[in-house]
């Protein structure tokens, strides 16, 4: 089974001293999407793209797919 991890996003936010509420505001996504990100649950590609715009990065810089055994 495969799962998604947003640990890279958490590190990027910490490195840029950005709180989740600030990211929600500038990337324009809902508290529901923020909760899903926090729980390592899938979110829409649109949300990921807006986050990438904020950090000027690629999707692979904010998340990764992990194979669970």
Please place each PLM-identified region on the residue numbering:
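Recognition helix of helix-turn-helix/homeodomain-like DNA-binding domains
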Residues: 28-43
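Alpha-helical residues within the helix-turn-helix
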Residues: 14, 25, 53
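Short, basic-rich loop-to-helix N-cap that marks the start of a DNA-contacting helix
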Residues: 40-53
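Key DNA-contact positions within bacterial/archaeal DNA-binding proteins
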Residues: 21, 32, 60
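A short, Lys/Arg-rich alpha-helix, primarily the initiator
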Residues: 1-22
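Short C-terminal boundary/hinge segments that cap the last helix of small helical domains
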Residues: 56-69
């Amino acid at each position: 089974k495969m799962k998604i991890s947003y640990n890279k996003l958490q590190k990027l936010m910490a490195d840029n001293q950005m709180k989740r509420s600030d990211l929600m505001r500038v990337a324009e996504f809902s508290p529901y999407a923020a909760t899903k990100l926090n729980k390592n649950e899938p979110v829409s590609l649109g949300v990921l793209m807006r986050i990438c715009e904020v950090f000027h990065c690629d999707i692979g810089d904010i998340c990764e797919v992990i194979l669970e055994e």
